[in-house]
């Protein structure tokens, strides 16, 4: 059963990565016009598919990875809040002329990205003493979140700035879920 879930998680992360890269071709990734939500104004159904696939892939990876911690269910409130954020993002247009929808969309997007990023960082923070690779992942996740926030404040939103932490999440969670942890045997 666990092996099946691992395979499903890897397949979801792979599909989400490929789909995100393909979806990003509708805009210029390093410009504001390449922001995932901006692309979604013209390609609403594709944006919805991207959102559902991204949320599902990250949540499945997070759920499996949290099974390696002593706090196996700690991810649940984060996933609920993140899911609510993604629902707000997908249900409301990123159109400044529709002010309420615009603000709800932005609120949802921020909730999804911030809460998911914090959850992944927390996961590796909890695992950091278990193995050095998790300490490295913890620092990596923290640095990516901080650098991404700084880039977002300086350059505004672009597809690359939005996608970097998502891709990092896919990679870090996939590696974590495929790793075998060393089991200490005491005699």
Model feature map: region roles:
Residues 5-13, 69-81, 130-141:
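Membrane-interfacial loop-to-transmembrane alpha-helix junctions, especially the N-terminal start
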Residues 13-30:
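Alpha-helical transmembrane segments of multi-pass membrane proteins
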Residues 17-22, 81-91, 142-153:
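Aromatic-anchored segments of alpha-helical transmembrane domains
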Residues 24-28, 65-66, 91-99, 126, ...:
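Juxtamembrane "helix-exit" motif on the non-cytosolic side of transmembrane helices
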Residues 28-42, 97-100:
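Membrane-interface interhelical loops and short amphipathic "cap" helices
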Residues 37-56:
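Interfacial helix-start motif at the membrane-water boundary
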Residues 82-133:
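Membrane-proximal helix-loop-helix units in multi-pass membrane proteins
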Residues 125-187:
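Terminal transmembrane helical module of multi-pass membrane proteins
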């Amino acid at each position: 059963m666990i092996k099946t879930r691992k395979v499903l998680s890897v397949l979801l992360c792979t599909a989400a990565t490929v789909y995100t890269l393909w979806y990003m071709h509708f805009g210029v990734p390093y410009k504001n016009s390449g922001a995932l939500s901006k692309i979604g104004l013209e390609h609403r159904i594709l944006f919805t598919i991207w959102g559902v696939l991204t949320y599902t892939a990250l949540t499945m990876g997070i759920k499996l990875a949290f099974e390696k911690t002593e706090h196996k269910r700690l991810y649940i409130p984060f996933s609920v809040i993140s899911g609510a954020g993604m629902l707000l993002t997908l249900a409301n247009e990123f159109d400044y002329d529709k002010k309420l929808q615009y603000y709800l969309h932005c609120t949802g997007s921020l909730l999804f990205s911030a809460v998911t990023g914090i959850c992944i960082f927390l996961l590796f923070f909890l695992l950091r003493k278990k193995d050095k690779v998790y300490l490295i992942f913890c620092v990596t996740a923290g640095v990516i979140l901080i650098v991404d926030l700084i880039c977002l404040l300086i350059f505004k939103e672009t597809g690359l700035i939005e996608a970097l932490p998502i891709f990092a999440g896919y990679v870090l969670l996939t590696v974590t879920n495929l790793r075998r942890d060393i089991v200490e045997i005491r005699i």
